Amino acid sequence: MYIKVLSVSELNNYIKRVVDSDYILSNAQVKGEISNFKFHSSGHVYFSLKDEGGKINCIMFRSNAEKLKFIPENGMKVNVKGRVSVYVKDGAYQLYCTEITPEGRGELYEAFEKLKEKLLNEGMFSEEHKRNIPKYPKMIGVITSPTGAAIRDIINVATRRNKSVDMIICPTLVQGVNAPGELIKALDYLNNREDIDTIILARGGGSIEELWAFNDEKLAYAVYNSKKPVVTGVGHETDFTIVDFVSDRRAPTPSAAAEIAVPNINEEMNSFVSLKRALDTSIKTYIQNKCNQLEIAKRMLEKNSPEILIVNGYSSIDNFKYVLDMRIANKIKIEKEKILRYNSILKSNSPINILNKGYSIISDEIGNNISNVDKLKEPDKVHITFKDGKVNAKIDILR
């Protein structure tokens, strides 16, 4: 029988075709422990899946890696779905993964994600729906197991923070098929009490199966529709349940839930003292500013009082009168000097002074002064005025 000699590439391609045509290998479901886990910059995920007897290299392409509901870690036991194929270039076979789920949680995890997506689409996780937790509650309702560590932690934290806050405990199952119903009844009971300010829904840590009651759909609606604000503290910090998403506030632990629901009286007192001091300082500053403004207004009023205005008015009148008197006196003095000067001029040019110098004034019979001889004719009569009297004369000869 003749057997063809194959090249390495031909052999690898042949093996790839054989593997790819195998139904089981094309629809593989494998469980094992993750090792050498790595996120590549391309977005692809590379890791190995191993057990006590062997190991297989795995790859998950970016399109599937983006759909992961959790972050895989080395040492984590998982279930993987995918297909086995051969990488021709290296001649190595590997598992091409399409899904990765934590081992033992596959169905529960899928149910959790399905319900979470449903409630998310209904808007039940909206921040707009979440209410503020009362800052100064008088009564807090606690729903949890009466025998677990959670109730002890809640009581211890609440007592330490504020002894004046009362609590009513509603003991219920916190795991098992009957737990959701009891939790819902406890919620209804506390919602019907008018004295309840806040509700704490809590339990200690556990496996996903033990915490599953808090992933119940009916319980989620009951928490969402609660008339009282609900604080959840289920499991440990890394545990998330459906009620955590629909509650008004999620706490990582039952103790943390008590810290959220119960105010620290010492911190509140210190805050009150600080606020009082700040208020006192603010009031004192306000009063001092008003006193300063009042003093300024008082000074302005004193400066502009009617009495001061009248006194200032009288002073202004006196000053004005003084200035006016001075100006009038000065004006009179100037006018007197003018009169004296004009009088001197008049006296110097007075006809009487001219007559005193030996001159005389000749006028005709009607009193007109005659200054030229051509105004006379023979035998006109004239009057001659001397300094000490008058004489009448007749013109006999004109020369």
Curated annotation (Swiss-Prot):
One cellular component term from this protein's GO annotations in UniProt: cytoplasm
Name listed for the protein in its UniProt record: Exodeoxyribonuclease 7 large subunit
InterPro entries: Exonuc_VII_L (IPR003753), Exonuc_VII_lsu_C (IPR020579), OB-fold_nuc-bd_dom (IPR025824)
Taxonomic source organism: Clostridium acetobutylicum (strain ATCC 824 / DSM 792 / JCM 1419 / IAM 19013 / LMG 5710 / NBRC 13948 / NRRL B-527 / VKM B-1787 / 2291 / W)
Main location: cytoplasm
Matches recorded under PANTHER family: EXODEOXYRIBONUCLEASE 7 LARGE SUBUNIT (PTHR30008:SF0)
Localisation: Cytoplasm
Its job: Bidirectionally degrades single-stranded DNA into large acid-insoluble oligonucleotides, which are then degraded further into small acid-soluble oligonucleotides.
Keyword Hydrolase applies: yes
Enzyme class per UniProt: hydrolase
Family statement: Belongs to the XseA family.
EC assignment: 3.1.11.6
Gene Ontology MF terms: exodeoxyribonuclease VII activity; nucleic acid binding
GO terms under biological process: DNA catabolic process
Pfam families recorded: Exonuc_VII_L, tRNA_anti_2
Keywords: Cytoplasm, Exonuclease, Hydrolase, Nuclease
Reactions this protein catalyses: Exonucleolytic cleavage in either 5'- to 3'- or 3'- to 5'-direction to yield nucleoside 5'-phosphates
